């Protein structure tokens, strides 16, 4: 073909080629997407377990300094602010100025004395309701 014959034709992908690419991308998303979603759900639960471990270390430091764990009414706030002007309090015991929330944006629950040990520290999980099974199960320091 001469240059004059090609001048009217535009280069690019045909409609069939675009449809084939979209079908392939859709198949890949259908296969890979659910697996990635399951991993993301599991990673939030793992974050809760790691944050609880961090809280446990900080609670131990509080206990060494004050001679006891924070009461239920003092809660985890006692880790970042002196609850009731305790003379032996040497905090803050957490690296942040606020108590972190769980990955679902809800406050961690704390009880002292606990039902499972000296204290109970737990998240109600993604549903935010006590109990639950599977991905909605509560995650606590006693598990």
Which sequence ranges carry the predicted segments?
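N-terminal leader/signal peptides at the extreme start of proteins
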Residues: 1-13
